[in-house]
């Protein structure tokens, strides 16, 4: 099975950002023979603070994602937070993602699966890898085209996450594709005064450790200038560092 790569900014900030990232991902795909899937959120519905930037919203966001596909020929992934969003999102993207906090929401998982698109279900920060059989079964019974499971760490006290890499082989017993979210797993939730902190310097180590445990997909949030990012600034990877990391994982 070919290794899957997913990369893009945390949130849709501007058309210019999407264009810059799309151009670089397309170039990496040509150079390395990969098929990196472009990801970005049209709405960050679970930001820490009411004043945090959320994105352009569904209608405008989907149009901006469509423009990325048209210009750069990239497959697309975005996440949904409410069941009614599944149908319009399914008309635009190749992969519908279920956020970790929402992976037990039956109606949400079923709505995504009924589009027939690939569904990427992120493991909640409070679940074990073995627990992911239940969201997987919901998506399978509802007719998902393909189902991926994603590891993104577990809560460790307050404002911290740790990764139990044993979850990866446990989830591989359930689904053939297990993705490592290498950037959200280095978050420090709510630890930066009304926003999430993080430690991006650990992203490459997370990726290689996950590969050693059998992960066959890798998820990276990237930005040309992460510290200026409007969401998850502390844990996004520099766009210029992505190609070297992807190459090292092939």
State what each model feature region is.
Residues 18-22, 85-86, 91-101, 106-115, ...:
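A short alpha/beta connector and helix-capping loop motif
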Residues 5-17, 36-58, 222-232:
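Glycine-rich, proline-tolerant flexible connector loops at the mouths of alpha/beta enzymes
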């Amino acid at each position: 099975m070919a290794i899957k790569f997913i990369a893009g900014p945390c949130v849709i900030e501007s058309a210019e950002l999407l264009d810059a990232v799309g151009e670089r991902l397309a170039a990496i795909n040509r150079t390395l023979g990969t098929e990196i899937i472009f990801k970005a959120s049209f709405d960050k519905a679970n930001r820490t603070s009411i004043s945090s930037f959320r994105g352009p919203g569904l209608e405008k966001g989907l149009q901006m994602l469509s423009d990325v596909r048209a210009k750069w020929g990239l497959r697309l992934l975005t996440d949904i937070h409410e069941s009614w969003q599944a149908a319009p999102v399914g008309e635009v993207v190749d992969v519908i993602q279920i956020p970790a906090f929402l992976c037990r929401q039956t109606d949400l998982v079923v709505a995504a699966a009924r589009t027939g698109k690939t569904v990427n279900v992120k493991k909640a920060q409070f679940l074990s890898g073995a627990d992911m059989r239940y969201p997987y079964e919901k998506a399978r019974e509802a007719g998902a085209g393909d189902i991926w499971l994603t590891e993104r760490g577990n809560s460790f006290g307050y404002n911290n996450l740790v990764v139990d890499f044993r979850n990866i082989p446990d989830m591989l017993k359930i689904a053939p594709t297990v993705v490592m979210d290498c950037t959200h797993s280095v978050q420090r939730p709510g630890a930066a005064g009304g926003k999430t902190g993080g430690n991006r310097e650990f992203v490459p180590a997370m990726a290689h450790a996950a590969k050693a445990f059998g992960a066959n997909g890798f998820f990276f949030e990237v930005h040309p200038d992460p510290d200026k990012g409007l969401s998850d600034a502390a844990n996004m990877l520099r766009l210029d560092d992505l190609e070297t990391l992807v190459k090292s994982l092939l």
